[in-house]
């Protein structure tokens, strides 16, 4: 995948259970991260793999959700749970370093 490191946010700005929308790997690519635990974050392309609608996190259902055609994805892996999407969400490698959340690469 593409490997350009980019600081996305101070980790203190994103509470556990919250999401943050950013742009990666380019300024035209919407991405979203979820802070699962104090030192655990995951991030994905915000574009559904079905027809490209915007996905968001549904905390009460513990899933990524696409409202266009009811596609649902597993929160940690981005794998398809249900609906028409043909494959998992594009995954962004993220990690917390020195209280900054870094995006380190993208796997479509």
Model region roles, listed by residue range:
Residues 1-59, 87-108:
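N-terminal pre-ligand scaffold of iron-sulfur
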Residues 33, 72-73:
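Hydrophobic beta-strand positions
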Residues 42, 71-72:
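A residue-level detector for well-ordered beta-strand positions
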Residues 50, 69, 76:
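Short glycine/serine/threonine-biased micro-segments
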Residues 56-59, 74-78:
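Short Cys/His-rich "knuckle" micro-motifs
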Residues 62-70, 80-90:
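Short cysteine/histidine-rich metal-coordination sites, predominantly Zn2+-binding motifs
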Residues 73-74, 94:
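Active-site and channel-lining beta-strand-loop segments
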